[in-house]
Amino acid sequence: QLVIAEKPSVARSIAGVIGADKKQDGYMEGNGYLVSWCIGHLVSLADAGTYDERFKKWRYDDLPILPQQWQYIIPNDKKKQFDTLRSLMKRPDVTGLVCATDAGREGELIFRFVYQMAGCKKPFQRLWISSMEDAAIKDGFAHLKPGTDYDNLYQSALCRAQADWLVGINATRLFSILYHKTLTVGRVQTPTLKILVDREAKISSFQKEKYHI
């Protein structure tokens, strides 16, 4: 089985527990396992300029930019590790995978993007643990779940990523054009900034008052 963790440190911890102690270039091997890792997001949603050359310039008339078919990119500094994972997935002795990325929405997305970008069709299971203690890892491998059990989690993560893209790309370009300087807008960033601004305004307008208890 090929086990894919979210980062090298987690992969090393898992490998130590399941007996994959032989170090290779970009992965570890042993006891019937291959253990490798992502480096955060190996695959990301492509920027607007990937869809059309004219989107590389920020113009009001091009808004909104609404992709009909989402495209993905692999950053140059992460291509080597992606190629390693894809190569491992294609090995004939790999009959299945274990998704061992972080137990959460974002971890699910990181694995699924790599899995799909690599064109892998092999079945996978999910390791869902919240502790990297040896006992927790052993227990997690004893209770692996079918990967399909987490399809809805992946869909929610994908929806979040696409929503961030649509709001970030379009709103940032719109307000930057209107204000004639870069003004970033984000689905989470901007409401959070509003909370801070409101709080600062209250602090600035505070006036001392006498009161009695």
Language-model features and meaning:
Residues 1-161, 165:
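Intrinsically disordered, low-complexity regulatory segments
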Residues 5, 164-213:
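Prokaryote-biased recognition of long, low-complexity C-terminal linker/tail segments
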